[in-house]
Amino acid sequence: SKLENLIFKDARSRIVNFLHEVVQKRGRQVGYEMLLKHSLTHQDIANITCTSRQTVTLVLNDLRKENLIYFNRGRILVRDMENLKACAA
């Protein structure tokens, strides 16, 4: 549940969980990857996950360095949904 998510998960897990959920619901398959076209800002993601914009930026950059996602304005490409989900556990 969302409440359990807020209480028991750290900021990174909440952000990763949110990404996984939204990409699964609204993204489309492109080869082995999932692409989400969106209009969310880092601040929007921060508001939804009860974190700061700086934390969202840090986590997204870390996920990009780990080659789990690629993103630019308006697009998030998840390279491996299973590995992304494992990061949120």
Tell where the protein language model's regions lie, with residue ranges:
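Charged/polar, solvent-exposed surface patches and flexible loops
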Residues: N5, N17, A86
